[in-house]
A protein has these predicted regions:
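Short, low-complexity N-terminal intrinsically disordered segments enriched in polar/charged residues
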Residues: 19, 24-46
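Sec-dependent N-terminal signal peptides of Gram-positive bacterial secreted proteins and lipoproteins
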Residues: 3-26
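Short solvent-exposed beta->alpha transition segments
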Residues: 50-101, 109
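Residue-level signal for cytosolic alpha-helical hairpin/rod architecture
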Residues: 34-37, 53, 113
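Absolute protein N-terminus
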Residues: 1, 25-29, 135
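A general boundary/transition motif marking the beginning of the first structured unit of a protein
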Residues: 28, 40-41, 60, 64, ...
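Exposed beta-sheet edge and beta->alpha loop/turn motif
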Residues: 87-135
Length: 135
């Protein structure tokens, strides 16, 4: 009986210790992803391309250029309204081959719980946005 209890305690302790790095990683990712993501969404509301693209890498800036920005914003906000500031809920992330995919649920004026993925990559020592998808 005592042996079974000791094994149970050890098992629980191992599981708790194994989750610590996961939660620590979550905090590190959210520390750069949350402000960058909020900035992108608020800049869309404001029609401010300079703010919208400030964390984009060069490829992302060329693919979603200042000329294309108004049409992009219209395609999103035209369907769901403006983003509701600070409504994003960080759901998690996945890192593979130096690319970190963050997942959020966000609210707009006309629709709640819209899925958003923001993709980051470290470039020249800074985490840059290399992808952005609304689902």
């Amino acid at each position: 009986m005592r042996k079974i209890r000791l094994i149970s305690i050890i098992t629980i302790l191992v599981l708790v210790l194994a989750t610590i790095p996961v939660f620590a990683g979550c905090g590190k990712v959210a520390a750069y992803a949350d402000p960058a993501t909020e900035n992108i969404l608020i800049a869309m509301n404001d029609g401010d391309y300079a703010s919208f693209s400030k964390d984009f890498d060069d490829t992302m800036k060329s693919e979603l250029s200042e000329d294309a920005f108004p049409d992009f914003v219209a395609s999103v906000n035209g369907q769901v309204g403006d983003y509701i500031a600070d409504s994003k809920d960080f759901k998690g992330f996945n890192t593979s081959n130096g690319i970190t995919t963050t997942e959020y649920m966000i609210d707009f004026e006309a629709m709640e719980d819209v899925a958003l993925e923001v993709i980051f990559q470290k470039i020249d020592g800074k985490m840059m946005v290399v992808g952005l998808w609304f689902n």
